Structures are given as C-alpha cells and as structure tokens.
Amino acid sequence: MSEEWVPKTQLGKLVASGQIKTMGEALRSKLPLKEYEIVDYLLPNLKDEVIDIKRAQRMTDSGRRMTYSITVVVGNGDGYVGLGIGRSKEAAPAIRKALINAKLNIMEIRRGCGSWECGCGRAHTLPFLVQGKSGSVRITLKPAPRGVGLAVGDVARTILSIAGIEDAWGFAAGHTKTTVNYALAVYNALKETSKVRINPGIVLSTPIYSGSVVNVSGHKD
C-alpha cells in the first residue's frame, strides 16, 4: 500500500485493516467506492488505455481556450473493468482525471463459455448474450467459441480485452463513430453480465465465473 494513502472512508479503512481482501469483496460490501487508491491496492496489476481524445476550442474575453476531454478504460484482464472521462485545459490532467474516474467506476463482470459451439467450461467469453446502449449507440455482444477472437470494433475490442474477454461476436447500431457513446454502450453491456439473475436451482451446462477466476484446469485465463 502507498505510504501516502491515508484511508478516509469506511471502505478504505476496511481494506487498509485487511478486513476486505479482494475487489470482489469491496464491491459486494455495498459501501461507496470513493478512493481510487482502494483499486490500486486490491488490483495492483491494473492496466489502462486511452481510447478517445477530444479537443474543443471556445472563445473567451482573453482569447481562444482549448479544453481536452479524454476517455480511459482500466482493467486487470481478469474480470474487472472500469471506464472514466476526464476534462481539463491540458491533456495530462485530463488523463489523470479520466484514470481516477475509471478506477472509481470499476466493476466485476461475469465470464464463462456461453457458446453452444464450444462448451469448454473456461472463462474465455461471455456467459450469455448481453446488450448495452448509450445515446444513439446500441450494441449486442454474443458468446463465441474459443479461437474466434474478438469480432468487434476497435474500441469494443480494447474494452473487452482489458476486461478479460478473449472471444466474442458483436453487433452495433447507431452513431458508432461517436467513440464515447460506443465505449459506454460496451461498458453498459458488460455491466449486464452481473445484473442477470441466475436461478440457483438450475443446473448449468458450463460454469459462470464472477470477477477474477482460476479455470477448471487450474490455469488462470
């Protein structure tokens, strides 16, 4: 843990004291995540990627001023992903704000082998079809068998990969060139993997994994 971080929230104090040991436990605690350092501590191998940079000029009394709006995705490549937007007069502070917001928006997703063509039981794809939307953009993500890869657009591929999805089919509609809405639609679709209720009495043909997993073979995806 960083020596500079002094937890200020109840969740932060529980993490610092070792009472909460995983990101999954932190999210399931229902306590608000307001300190990005919690994510840094519980997911030390988190990766980040800038997926959109927008620059806008506006006239002021002192002349033209540039404003940056930057979108960043973070993930551990194993069941956790977050998306954030940051705005500032300069690029570096905007990226930092976006990175912090992405960490505060971290979520746990479900994975599995939802493709009837595969049935390997590993956490390589989506457990079932999910849909997401943002603005005019609508996206559908479908499970795919091992080896297909990510048959989606570049932005969706970046988000799915950093979330730990290796194989998927995707179909998008609307103004998909609006990168921010496209990214948010993908993020919202992944959020649906954890919202679907699964009847505990149903016997699943393949396992469904939440968050970071170790496959049945004993090897981590």
Curated annotation (Swiss-Prot):
Record InterPro entries: Ribosomal_Su5_D2-typ_SF, Ribosomal_uS5, Ribosomal_uS5_arc, Ribosomal_uS5_C, Ribosomal_uS5_euk/arc, Ribosomal_uS5_N, Ribosomal_uS5_N_CS, Ribsml_uS5_D2-typ_fold_subgr
Keyword Secreted: no
UniProt cross-references to Pfam families, sorted A to Z: Ribosomal_S5, Ribosomal_S5_C
Domain S5 DRBM: 46-109
Keywords on record: Ribonucleoprotein, Ribosomal protein, RNA-binding, rRNA-binding
Entry's Gene Ontology BP terms: translation
GO (cellular component) term, any one: cytosolic small ribosomal subunit
UniProt KW Ribosomal protein keyword: yes
Coiled-coil residue windows: none
TM helices/strands, residue ranges: none
Gene Ontology MF terms in the entry: rRNA binding; structural constituent of ribosome
The family this protein is said to belong to: Belongs to the universal ribosomal protein uS5 family.
Biological role: With S4 and S12 plays an important role in translational accuracy.
Database matches in HAMAP family: Ribosomal_uS5_A
Record remark on domains: The N-terminal domain interacts with the head of the 30S subunit; the C-terminal domain interacts with the body and contacts protein S4. The interaction surface between S4 and S5 is involved in control of translational fidelity.
Assembly behavior: Part of the 30S ribosomal subunit. Contacts protein S4.
Protein name (database record): Small ribosomal subunit protein uS5
Organism: Thermoplasma acidophilum (strain ATCC 25905 / DSM 1728 / JCM 9062 / NBRC 15155 / AMRC-C165)
Gene (UniProt): rps5
